[in-house]
Amino acid sequence: MKEFVDFIGRALGAFFLFVALMVVSCDKVPSEGDEVADPDPITGYVNLSASSTANSYIINQGGSYRISAVRGNDASDVLQTARTAEVLWESFGSSLSLSAGALIKSVLYKDGYICFKTNDHFKKGNAVVAAKDESGKILWSWHIWMTDQPQEHVYKNDAGTLMDRNLGATSAAPDEYSVGLMYQWGRKDPFMGPSSFDQNREFAKSSITWPTPVASDPSTGTVEYAIANPTTFITYNANNKGWYYTPSAQMTDTSWGWTDSKKEKSIYDPCPAGWRVPDGGREGVWEKAGFNDIASEYVDEKGVYANMSSSLKIWFPNSGYLSGAGSL
């Protein structure tokens, strides 16, 4: 089985930590923008979830799209009480301001699908759409990643195949659009990354004012709260070393699937279909690929330039990190 890996790069002080996302199958996402044969009566909307469902979907051209209103990669876990849909936020991932509708001009819920249309002039960026019940409660939300199709980079020693960019990045070149999005460990929904590589960083602009972070307590430090409040950062809990208030198997074993002995993709995994969060440690991609034995490296404000060998050089963006309080 071929392994595919996506990654989020994060800088920790002067040292760089890269959290990888790995796939469990070699099945690829159908080319976004191509019509997928589907017997469903909803016409005019390309079904991005026809082959497989996920918490993130890539599109690389304008049009009308739909995704199944299910929980992550579990196509059988249908949101039975969903009644409406909403765009929660949009962003170019930079310092450029934008208003609602800049990327996605309309969204609706219909017959078990979230249906949306992009702006007439397709632009690269990120958005999150949500399904709500009759009372307006968010039942689930999905990341819409608007970018050119990421390329695959195969790493040695059967370590895996990395994407050429961070999750949410709209560029693989050494520029501000390569930074990507930020995630709290185990949560499927993204937060804004920095707007640039400047040392005095600010969050990338988006179409909303983000809620004030909340402290983790018995009511907020739960998976249920995180799902219903995808734009709210839950601050660090000193007792449990994270946002989750009460440790349990639901958090440690299935949040992103890292310690799942079956190597199955968790429904909370933030990766697109065909990709997943990988294992760490000695059997992880970084150890196998030899990242701990890099010959030499050069660091500047944009990132790390590393010599894996005399003939192979790689670059990772200086994406920064979110503190336990939710600040850059």
Segments from the language model and where they lie:
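N-terminal leader/targeting segments
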Residues: G13-F15, V19
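Bacterial Sec-dependent N-terminal signal peptides
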Residues: K2-E3, V19-G44
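Short, solvent-exposed loop/turn segments at the edges of extracellular beta-sandwich modules
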Residues: E134-S135
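Bacterial N-terminal signal peptides that target proteins for export
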Residues: K2-G13
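Extracellular ectodomain segments of secreted/surface proteins
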Residues: D34-E90, G101-S106
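Short hydrophobic motif
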Residues: M1-K2, L162
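Conserved positions within compact, well-structured domain cores
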Residues: I67, A75-K124, V128, W140-L328
